[in-house]
A protein has these predicted regions:
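Helicase P-loop NTPase motor core
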Residues: 1-44, 48-52, 65
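Short, aromatic/basic amphipathic alpha-helical patches
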Residues: 32-41, 129-142
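A short, glycine/Asx- and small/polar-enriched loop/turn
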Residues: 53-58
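Conserved helicase C-terminal RecA-like lobe
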Residues: 16-19, 60-135
Length: 143
């Protein structure tokens, strides 16, 4: 949460707060992120249903962000434990598992493509396997 607070706090100082979003996997994670940022002095607004309130960076689920563009996006918690979610439940049916994996991949694409100018992706422990090729190419290009 400290790195998230540092990045989002800097974006807010740069007057980018109204075009900034933190995207998370689910509603419970959204609430944890809002609380953690508040504890670190970074004001955000949780967005569920309805319009997006002006004045502060928003925190919303990846699903909720569909169709909305932001200047800067922080994808929080894109770890192997959270994305893809529930794929093991389809181990008994390959076709259903393939469809579920495609939906998870599409969700991650939608979330990442909400960023117009800057995208930051974070994870704990291991990154999502859906990021592995991208993470490898970024790591190679920055070393």
């Amino acid at each position: 949460f400290d790195y998230l607070a540092k990045v989002v706090g800097q974006w807010a100082k740069d007057r980018q707060s109204e075009t900034t979003a933190v995207l998370v996997r689910d509603r419970s994670q959204r609430e944890r992120v809002v609380d953690a940022l508040h504890e670190r002095g970074v004001q955000t607004r949780a967005v569920g249903h309805g319009s997006i309130p002006p004045g502060a960076p928003v925190v919303m689920t990846m699903h909720r962000a569909k169709g909305i563009e932001f200047s800067k996006v922080f994808l929080f918690g894109v770890s192997s434990r959270s994305i893809p979610m529930g794929i093991k439940d389809y181990d008994f049916d390959k076709d259903e598992g393939d469809q579920a994996l495609l939906r998870e991949r599409s969700l991650l694409y939608v979330a990442a493509s909400r960023a117009r100018d800057e995208l930051v992706v974070s994870w704990t422990d291991q990154p999502s396997p859906l990021l592995s090729a991208s993470v490898s190419s970024v790591a190679a290009s920055t070393s």
